[in-house]
């Protein structure tokens, strides 16, 4: 195929983003891991093989990358660590988050405007599932999964916790609501993003959070994989 492109007069092969994107991505711009070539595209070995073949036919490779943002998605481990540990996360300042915004409710927190409606209304529909183990816990609410801050839930056995946070009861819903208030993020309706969001997005897309790529530590981490072939 590369030989055909060379005969047609092409000088380069253009590749859309090749690092790991969220599952089901059709374009690769919603990156969840900048440090690896996507296994779905063949991984590092496939890229090296393509580079060798292209070079043997006099072709270069033009690689499209997106170092300025990532997907705000559960598959993004940097993002998940920020949600779980807040300012204590080593990645807290890798994303362009305003940790001290004008809103007192968001100071030291990240707005998570990913819900279809308010938390209260969602709890009434019982769209909540909790996952606990000895060290970590997560909550599934309205189809999204969010990590819980360590120590933000009572020291009970998993079965007891499920009963304690049973959203079929008013007490259970109140407890889940209070649990969410203790987190390093504030879950909210997507409608809140326009006025209240405290982190830089890619344009107005709340699924894509900006990186502080101008900071050397972030730059080096992102470019670890995006090196010349």
Functional labels for PLM-detected ranges:
Residues 207-218:
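Glycine-rich phosphate-binding "P-loop"
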Residues 218-228:
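Structured alpha-helical segments in the cores of large, soluble enzyme domains
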Residues 1-203, 211, 229:
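Acidic/aromatic-lined carbohydrate-recognition and catalytic surfaces
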């Amino acid at each position: 195929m590369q030989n055909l492109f060379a005969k047609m007069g092409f000088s380069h092969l253009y590749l859309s983003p090749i690092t790991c994107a969220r599952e089901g991505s059709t374009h690769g711009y919603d990156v969840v891991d900048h440090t690896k070539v996507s296994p779905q595209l063949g991984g590092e070995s496939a890229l090296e093989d393509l580079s060798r073949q292209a070079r043997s036919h006099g072709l270069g490779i033009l690689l499209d990358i997106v170092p300025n943002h990532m997907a705000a998605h559960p598959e993004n481990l940097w993002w998940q660590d920020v949600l779980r540990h807040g300012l204590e996360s080593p990645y807290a300042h890798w994303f362009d988050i305003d940790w001290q915004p004008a809103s007192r409710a968001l100071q030291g927190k990240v707005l998570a405007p990913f819900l279809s409606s308010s938390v209260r209304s969602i709890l009434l529909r019982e769209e909540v599932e909790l996952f606990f183990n000895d060290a970590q816990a997560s909550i599934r609410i309205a189809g999204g999964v969010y990590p819980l801050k360590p120590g933000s839930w009572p020291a009970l056995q998993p079965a007891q916790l499920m009963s304690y946070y049973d959203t079929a009861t008013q007490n259970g819903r109140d407890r889940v609501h209070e649990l969410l208030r203790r987190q390093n993020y504030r879950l909210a309706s997507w409608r809140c993003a326009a006025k209240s969001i405290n982190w830089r997005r890619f344009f107005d897309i709340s699924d894509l959070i900006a990186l502080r790529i101008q900071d050397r530590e972030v730059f080096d981490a992102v470019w670890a994989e995006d090196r010349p072939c």
